[in-house]
């Protein structure tokens, strides 16, 4: 039976993923995390893993990413999606995420992360992850 837990006093509820912003939800160990595709997250992933986001998307499509790489990717997108007052999520550990991904299942998690990475390389969002305005045609 599912328990409906309310946030403790002084803590806000976790934000929900907004697909209009290209966000997705990743559930690890029963906790839902918002994955938000921002330029800051993309730059952190590229710097940490030493490759372009496009190359990482290609590797994801070939199921060629390690657990640690998946933890790094998930961590950057989770930190980008953290609520401003959620210091615990904002400081989430990539190695701990890799362990949780191992427990959850690499293929399941890879599908979700691949969708968010595809949103990064396909564009249509501001660096902060908001949808870009569409110009009206005359």
Report residues per predicted region.
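Charged interaction scaffolds used for protein-protein
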Residues: 1-32, 51-65, 84-138
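Short capping micro-motif at the N-terminus of alpha-helices
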Residues: 35-37
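Short, surface-exposed, low-complexity cationic segments
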Residues: 39-57
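Amphipathic alpha-helical interface surfaces
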Residues: 41, 66-74, 109
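Short, hydrophobic/amphipathic alpha-helical patches that form generic packing surfaces
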Residues: 69-80, 115-118
């Amino acid at each position: 039976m599912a328990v409906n837990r309310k946030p403790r006093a002084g803590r806000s509820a976790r934000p929900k993923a907004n697909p209009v912003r290209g966000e997705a939800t990743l559930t690890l160990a029963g906790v839902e995390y918002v994955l938000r595709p921002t330029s800051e997250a993309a730059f952190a992933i590229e710097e940490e893993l030493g490759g372009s986001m496009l190359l990482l998307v290609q590797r994801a499509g070939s199921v060629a990413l390690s657990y640690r790489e998946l933890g790094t990717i998930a961590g950057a997108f989770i930190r980008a999606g953290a609520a401003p007052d959620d210091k615990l999520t904002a400081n989430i550990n990539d190695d701990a995420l890799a362990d949780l991904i191992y427990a959850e299942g690499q293929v399941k998690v890879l599908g979700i992360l691949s969708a968010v990475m595809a949103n990064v390389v396909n564009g249509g969002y501001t660096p902060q992850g908001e949808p870009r305005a569409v110009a009206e045609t005359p």
